[in-house]
Amino acid sequence: MELKEYQESAKRFINVNLTSMGISSHALFGLCSEVGELHGLFQKELQGHKIDETHAKKELGDVLWFVAEVATAFGWDLNEIAQMNIEKLEARYPNGFEVEKSLHRKEGDI
């Protein structure tokens, strides 16, 4: 599934009674919660538990849904956001990730 298709499908599950700011607030609270749940699964792995791959994928899917909800609230296209992110990373690390470049990022590099 492509990101644009996912975003369009995920839109059905947004509470349309909220304003754009309400939708984005809901999404950001939810995103924090889901990242915490995902973190908990990986924290247990450090304690000797095996990662439940299916559970982790479902939590990661929830993270994706909340990211899509923020984008949709403001009419932003996930494909465009993904492309912008890759372009930013390519400009920052033209030869792939380098620790030295990470330690000495240019001023204003967000």
How should each PLM-predicted stretch be described?
Residues 1-110:
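Flexible "arm" and connector segments at domain edges
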